[in-house]
Amino acid sequence: MNQVATKKEGALSANLFEADANKGSQNISQEDLALPFLKVLGQLSPEVNKTHGKYVEGAEPGKIINTVTNELYSNINVIPVFYKRQYIEWQDRGQSTGAPVAIHEADSDIVSTTTRDKSYKDRLPNGNYLENTANHFVILMGDSPTTALISMKATQIKVSRKWNSMMRGIKMQGKNGLFTPPTYSHIYNLKPVQMSNDKGTWFGWDVAKIGPVTDKSIYDIAKNFAERVGKGEVQAKHGSEETNSTPY
């Protein structure tokens, strides 16, 4: 039997890869990409359940997970680039496919057709419910900054409002006086904290400002992402397990 000998070599030169840059991905559009969600894991998150198909080794309540790479964090540094609030329409568990029935803009009249049920869900006449969802598109800092989305709902809406107030409250001195810089001018630290009310306890977000962006290349990445989101070129693919496991 003929055998083909394979010569062992070291790593290929980056120059070789650069000569073929982007080849093989010419037909990949934004529609074919998954925007990572950053969420806080809770007791009911499938990632912490060792018998679940979505279990992630090392995952535990109170950790942050990147839903695309499954990387786990105790805290993260992010640059917020764009904010968008929406009402996401869901079916109840057991009936849902795991994807939203529809996504309604924040100024939609559909909200006026809902009634609050005993579980504090805003029910539509068709039996589905709406979830007020605050979407924060961010740059996740690290060795290789990446785009991501943090969605806040239920009790985390208060955290989102606080974060928005922090961003709007920043003032800088310019040649024409004080001005409010773009949200992507500053870096924030987000970490999970335990929260509670008369219904129970859960993990939510805590947000703290670190300071201004000092690297122009990072600033340019954040600005470009903000512009793409603003033009509608980046769409979040919400799923029932992409947001925080916040039961209240």
Q: Where are each of the predicted segments found?
A:
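Extended serine/threonine-enriched, polar tracts that run as long, contiguous segments within proteins
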Residues: 132-210
